[in-house]
Amino acid sequence: MKTFDELYAELTEKARTRPAGSRTVAELDAGVHAIGKKVLEEAAEAWMAAEHESDEATAEEISQLLYHAQVLMIARGIDLQAVYRHL
């Protein structure tokens, strides 16, 4: 299990080192528009899971939403502190 901060650090490292076959690198290369579409898709899936599926399925969908939101942050050069200032 990892925290939100640990996930961000892991994704930032992947963006920096660009390992072959990395889903994160592929998503970053696709650009902000494509990443934004994934954020919307995952948000809808989290909502549908919350309406119609188990807590476990909902948690999994939310984890995917958080992943794609962080990839979007990295693509835009937004760090965690910039987001935390708005919480």
Curated annotation (Swiss-Prot):
Cellular compartment(s): Cytoplasm
Molecular-function GO terms, alphabetical: ATP binding; phosphoribosyl-ATP diphosphatase activity
Has UniProt tagged this entry with the keyword Cytoplasm?
yes
Q: What CDD domains is this protein classified in?
A: NTP-PPase_HisE
Indicate where this protein is primarily found: cytoplasm
Instruction: Tell me the route in metabolism or biology where this protein functions.
Output: Amino-acid biosynthesis; L-histidine biosynthesis; L-histidine from 5-phospho-alpha-D-ribose 1-diphosphate: step 2/9
Q: Name one GO biological process term.
A: L-histidine biosynthetic process
Record-stated family: Belongs to the PRA-PH family.
Q: What is this protein called?
A: Phosphoribosyl-ATP pyrophosphatase
Species in which this protein is naturally found: Beutenbergia cavernae (strain ATCC BAA-8 / DSM 12333 / CCUG 43141 / JCM 11478 / NBRC 16432 / NCIMB 13614 / HKI 0122)
List the gene name. hisE
